[in-house]
């Protein structure tokens, strides 16, 4: 399950030599299939600072009691290439004091999506370091 897989970072972008142009290419996301020129490697850049804050949308309303709890994310496939906006949402129904990947800190400073009593409000999360620190295998 997603809850048992620790998050070690968030993809910030990739760098590769494009097959068609043979020139260095940067992309903010990885979209399969990307085959670099001459079967070279793709270099991934990952934000792995455990206290990095991220803004994410919720899939349901949040209560104040849910702040500082941990949550898993639903990875949806409806994101867009043109804006880079993800459709991943924080699974509010799946919460635990310490076992899931993301810890909800507070509502985000987003005036248009700040109502925590509504689904898809913007909240601030950080990685839950409990999974990394207590991982035994």
Question: Which positions does each model-derived feature cover?
Answer:
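Surface-exposed, low-hydrophobicity beta-strand/loop segments enriched in small/polar/acidic residues
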Residues: 1-137
């Amino acid at each position: 399950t997603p809850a048992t897989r620790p998050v070690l970072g968030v993809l910030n972008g990739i760098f590769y030599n494009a097959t068609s142009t043979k020139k260095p290419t940067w992309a903010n996301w990885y979209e399969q299939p990307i085959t670099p020129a001459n079967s070279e490697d793709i270099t991934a850049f990952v934000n792995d600072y455990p206290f990095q804050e991220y803004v994410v949308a919720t899939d349901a309303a949040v209560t104040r009691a849910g702040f500082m709890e941990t949550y898993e994310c639903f990875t949806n496939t409806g994101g867009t290439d043109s804006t880079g906006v993800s459709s991943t949402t924080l699974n509010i129904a799946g919460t635990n004091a310490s076992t899931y990947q993301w810890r909800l800190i507070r509502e985000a400073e987003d005036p248009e999506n700040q109502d925590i009593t509504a689904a898809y409000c913007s909240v601030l999360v950080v990685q839950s370091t409990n999974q990394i620190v207590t991982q035994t295998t």
